C-alpha cells in the first residue's frame, strides 16, 4: 500500500506539465501585447511626446522582463519538478538549463520581481504629477517590500548553503 501511494505521489508531478505549458501560452499572449504596443506607437512616432515614448519603452522593457521570468519559471520549474528536458546536443541550449535548483530559481524570481517593480515605479514617477501622494507612498512601500524580501531570501539562502543554521 505504501509503495502504491509513493508511486502515485511521484507520478502526480506530471500534473504540473500542463501548468508549465499554460505559461508558454501566457508568453504567447504577452508577445502579442508587446507587438500590439509597438504597432500602436510606430505610426505616431514623429508626433508622440518624448515622455510618452519613454513610458511606452518602459512598458516594453517591463513586458520583456516578465517574459524572461516566464521562460525561467517554465523551464526551471519543469526540470526541477517534472522531468529533465531532452534537448539534442546540436540544438541551441540555454546555458543555465539543468543547473538551477529550486533555491536558485526562487532567488532569480525575486530579483526579477524587484526589476519589474523598479520599472513600474519608474513609470509611476514619470507621471507623478497625476498621482496622489499617498498612492505614490504605497508604490514605494510595496517596492521596498519586494527589495527587502529578495534581500532576506538571498541572505537566508546564503546561510543555508554555508551550513550555518
UniProtKB/Swiss-Prot annotation:
Signal peptide: none annotated. Pfam families: UPF0114. It is a multi-pass membrane protein. Keywords: Cell membrane, Membrane, Transmembrane, Transmembrane helix. InterPro entries: UPF0114, UPF0114_bac. It comes from the Bacteria. GO terms for cellular component: plasma membrane. It is found in: Cell membrane. The chain crosses the membrane at residues 15-35, 53-73, 136-156. NCBIfam families: HI0507. Belongs to the UPF0114 family. This is UPF0114 protein Ent638_3411.
Amino acid at each position: 500500500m505504501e509503495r502504491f501511494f509513493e508511486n502515485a505521489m511521484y507520478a502526480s508531478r506530471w500534473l504540473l506539465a500542463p501548468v508549465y505549458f499554460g505559461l508558454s501560452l501566457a508568453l504567447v499572449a504577452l508577445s502579442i501585447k508587446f507587438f500590439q504596443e509597438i504597432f500602436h506607437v510606430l505610426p505616431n512616432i514623429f508626433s508622440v511626446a518624448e515622455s510618452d515614448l519613454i513610458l511606452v519603452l518602459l512598458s516594453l522593457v517591463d513586458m520583456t522582463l516578465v517574459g524572461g521570468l516566464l521562460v525561467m519559471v517554465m523551464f526551471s520549474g519543469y526540470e526541477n519538478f517534472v522531468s529533465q528536458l531532452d534537448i539534442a546536443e546540436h540544438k541551441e541550449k540555454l546555458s543555465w538549463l539543468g543547473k538551477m535548483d529550486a533555491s536558485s530559481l526562487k532567488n532569480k524570481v525575486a530579483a526579477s520581481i524587484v526589476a519589474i517593480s523598479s520599472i513600474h515605479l519608474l513609470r509611476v514617477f514619470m507621471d507623478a504629477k497625476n498621482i496622489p501622494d499617498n498612492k505614490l507612498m504605497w508604490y514605494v512601500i510595496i517596492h521596498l517590500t519586494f527589495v527587502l524580501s529578495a534581500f532576506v531570501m538571498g541572505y537566508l539562502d546564503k546561510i543555508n548553503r554555508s551550513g550555518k543554521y
